[in-house]
Amino acid sequence: MPKTIIIQGSSKSFGNTHKIVKYLSSNEQYDVIDLKTKNIGPFDYDFANATDDFLPLMEKIITNYDTIIFATPVYWYSMSGILKDFFDRLSDLLHYRKELGRQMKGKRMAMISNSNENDLKDGFTMPFKASASYLGMTYLGDTHTW
């Protein structure tokens, strides 16, 4: 049976994004990773953050899950900074750990966002859709709540 994980990308572990994630994970028994609890540095071409939590976390995700749901608040018309760092670090899978990155192909991705507005600005979903396409993943869709 396919397994799903929700990656909670909020700078606030117990805010509105957490409420959504908690509801979904309890009803569907999805596993959750709170990026706020992880030490994930920014991407750099020198691979200076090779020993942080990103690569072990990606090994766990790629090995154990078929579907990844990203949950993020809207910060300044975009995904949260903590989730953006995570997305930037996907470059590690294209440069330094290609064999791991290739295993993203065929997996599924979805996105949940929330803010104090009832809709998203144009372009918000583009990084999710484009990343899924580039990595050979199926983009299942997205939803926004407020």
PLM region spans:
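N-terminal beta1-alpha1-beta2 submodule of the flavodoxin-like/Rossmannoid cofactor-binding fold
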Residues: 1-100, 140-144
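Short, glycine-/small-residue-rich phosphate/pyrophosphate-handling segment
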Residues: 99-142
